[in-house]
Amino acid sequence: QKECTGPQHCTNFCRKNKCTHGKCMNRKCKCFNCK
């Protein structure tokens, strides 16, 4: 998977968690919609 850069969002499963450096704060979360 590509590392996220810029605005990021987490999957609906962990919507409350924010993405940081291509990884969500919760390991179960995955980043998407990365630009």
From Swiss-Prot:
Disulfide bonds join 4-24, 10-29, 14-31, 19-34. The record marks 23 as: Basic residue of the functional dyad. Expressed by the venom gland. One of its GO terms (cellular component) is extracellular region. SUPFAM superfamilies: Scorpion toxin-like. PROSITE patterns: SCORP_SHORT_TOXIN. The modification Lysine amide is found at residue 35. The record marks 32 as: Aromatic residue of the functional dyad. Its main location: secreted. Gene3D superfamilies: Knottin, scorpion toxin-like (3.30.30.10). The modification Pyrrolidone carboxylic acid is found at residue 1. One of its GO terms (molecular function) is potassium channel regulator activity. It comes from the Eukaryota. InterPro entries: Scorpion_toxin-like_sf, Scorpion_toxinS_K_inh. Keywords: Amidation, Disulfide bond, Ion channel impairing toxin, Neurotoxin, Potassium channel impairing toxin, Pyrrolidone carboxylic acid, Secreted, Toxin, Voltage-gated potassium channel impairing toxin. It is found in: Secreted. High affinity blocker of Kv1.3/KCNA3 channels of human T cells. Blocks Kv1.2/KCNA2 with an order of magnitude smaller than for Kv1.3/KCNA3. Negative results: does not block the calcium-activated KCa3.1/KCNN4 potassium channels, Shaker IR, Kv1.1/KCNA1, and Kv2.1/KCNB1 potassium channels. Belongs to the short scorpion toxin superfamily. Potassium channel inhibitor family. Alpha-KTx 06 subfamily. Has the structural arrangement of an alpha-helix connected to antiparallel beta-sheets by disulfide bonds (CS-alpha/beta). Monomer. This is Potassium channel toxin alpha-KTx 6.12. The lineage of its organism: Eukaryota, Metazoa, Ecdysozoa, Arthropoda, Chelicerata.
